[in-house]
Amino acid sequence: MNSMLIIPPLFGMAGLLVALLIYFVVLKYDGGTDKVKKIADQIHLGAMVFMRREYSYLFIFVTVLIILTYLALGLNTAIAVTAGAISSSLAGWLGMFSATKANSRTATAAANQGAKTALSIAFYGGSIMGLCVASLGLVGLGGLYFYFGGDPDTARAIEGFGMGASCVALFSRVGGGIFTKSADVGADLVGKIEAGIPEDDPRNPGVIADNVGDNVGDVAGMGSDIFESYCGAMIASIAIAATLDDSGRMLLPLALASIGLISSILGILIVKAASSLDADVALRTGTIGSAVIFIIIAFFLTQSMLGEDGLNVWLAVLTGAVGGVLIGLITEYYTGSKPVEDIAKSGETGSATVMITGLAVGMQSVVIPILVLASIIWISTYLTGLYGVGIAAVGMLATVGITMAIDAYGPVADNAGGIAEMAGMGEETRKITDSLDEVGNSTAAIGKGFAIGAAALAALAIIAAFVETIAHSRGGEFVLLLSDPKVLVGMFIGISIPFLISSITMTAVGDAAFEMINEIRRQFKEIPGLLEGNAEPDTAKCVDIATSAALKRMLLPGIIAVSAPAVVGFGLGAESLGGMLGGGLIGCVSMALMMANAGGAWDNAKKYIEKGNLGGKGTDTHAAAVVGDTVGDPFKDTSGPSMNILINVMAIVSLVISPLL
């Protein structure tokens, strides 16, 4: 078994090499005219400036965390925290860098070579992000597992990797979400409603910040989010297996992730081969093909590693993989088709009915995914105990390379459309980029649903590992009873935290958008000839406002998420902490689903009207839908996504400190 420990990090290094090769392929395509390059450079520079400033804040926070971890839990756990933070930061940075290089090339290919080449470039840009997430997880986590020699006692320090990755993910998701939505809301309200100019119009001072936001929120933020769930699922499975002293089950999550990476690379090749088909068909073919390949190889892997126990474990893996697909499809329904048409129709009677209908859709959309998650939990636990929950989460996330690639494709296509509009590349080019963007909106909605389901399952697996670790350290059972006041107190505290964090992040977007709106209004008023197209806006000022606002307001949610488990655990005991995690999980998952789906439905209702339905642009119905979309933006891209990471941060911090309770 020891000779197998080196395989996962080697697979991860191979995946990084493939990502590098794809990056060089992207660079070979034409970057466009000088005007296109200038716009792309502004987006790239704005994104990288934000990342540098964000990571400088993160460096201070993570350094303090590493020192505290070293003092409380020793060197090995501190090393793991450092590795997790570096890996998560690298995944976000590399994905952002490559996405901002692919956007102008996608727009240029749409103008000169057509939809097929444009799809390939946009997808390649997303693939780099996907492969970096999967590969860095294997290199970091697999490398630590190899370093600790697969020993159950020392391998528990790996839990620190999840804490480091989670902290980076939370700051990236919250900071990126505040940035992107303050820019988006400001640009939309002043540009579309007040000035009456189209989206991505070069006269709008907030348009570059809006395009930068697509990258910092939906590429770097989403990448860190998925990375943290991906690693969290593996860590939880390893931790549960460690309490059983079962080295085979400890190594299995890393082995499954390794074949998941290979399956993802094959899925990327399938998308390339199918690129002559419609974009949505090509992307679905790659996703399904990758999942089928993974499930088949996983069957033989589990049999060879676990013998007669392998079948039940494989069925748990299958349950997680199928559950992830189902949650994505349910999300697609609620953010498209009839629910969206109902919201758009309600706009005929004003913005109030748009808000009411959208909230109703969001609330209804929570029910079926929760039932799917409950089914996964019941089936996987029945098959192979608490370990089944962790391994089901691994099954859902193993093909993260292709899943994240398709999700990151969306912002690249969106940016390409923005560049085409700002550079005046013509109606035909815009039609191609719009068709790619439309598919990107669908994949983004599915990706958000998948991310919520994955985060929920990963968090539950980590909570299960927390319970097993406490029981193991106490030499007996650790049971959380609803009749125990300590557990109930913890549950009420836990369920209140998602509402507090949502309030903080929504308020942050509102405050930042207020600053952005005032700046855009000032420029329209004070720069002569700007609205007529005879002068250039000061886009850098808007980027700076969004950056400063995001960095100032991202710290408080992060501090609350990290400190709450320690305060409850050391103040009220392990029972209250277990209750807090249970309450927090239910609150976070419900809030995340409602906000993501309501926001996505509002967004697509606006786009449905903009296609010419119900009178099209410029009507009162359209204005009402824009209000819904504006409220939905921080729902689906700031507060909703922060719930995924919030519960995982609380769970992994609880698991790390469990030996001290």
Question: Which stretches of residues belong to each language-model region?
Answer:
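Hydrophobic packing and interface segments
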Residues: 1-661
